[in-house]
């Protein structure tokens, strides 16, 4: 197999290498170190590094004899990416009576925190069937409750993402006090203020999540102020801040859960033919993460936008707040011009 490189890829590799030296970057995987071909457990263990003390790690990238997980070349904009297969008839993550969908990784993070960001790029290939819904990666902590296991003692939580029927995007959160035994859906519509956000087939999307743990004034009775936020292509689509994620302040954001499959568990969730999703630029950080603009530009948020990643060009394009919400185009009296590594200027305001 041949690795393809261009000047753009060299810049990506340099920026990735720099990003991994920054203390607030917990994990970064962009697959430029991999050849086109099968991407199995051995490769995943090297890329999605885990801490050495948490025994809950799980790599399941060899589903269906290695047919579900591959590295493919996606052109100069993304280079090598992870392509996951959702076989015809697959439901859920396991090899039972149907083929197992896609792949799974539970990554105990090398660093934990009470506030953590995660991000990745996602591309639903042509012909993808949303059916009734399916799971996408997200952050979790403690026992990382999923399935029909409800948190009852404040010792775990999860905040994965789902696509629903028609491509509607939601956050599936397991937390103390949830209404459904299968976790509660929080629509990506900013609490009803915005139209329901949707995934579009044949388009690269950028997903950014931020999870902030709730406070615990009394051990065993956590406060209802945990917060989960989400941005889709630079737009804030979710901001819920009434969650009881933990009952003890020893529980943190400590895992990234690359969990993706159709389901649900019954046949009506299953695709009628082989489906594919592409992923790129998996990032976990204790500081805010870049979001991708609709025009293809990139804006860095927080400390991750550093002098070493900048170069100057002629004029600004967008204005963003540090938390990721967009102010608009043009100038802003309280904004600061920040040149980015891709040769664009943005304005970022506090």
Question: Residue spans of the language-model regions?
Answer:
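Positively charged n-region of N-terminal signal peptides that target proteins for export
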Residues: 1-5, 350
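Hydrophobic h-region of N-terminal signal peptides that target proteins for export
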Residues: 11-19
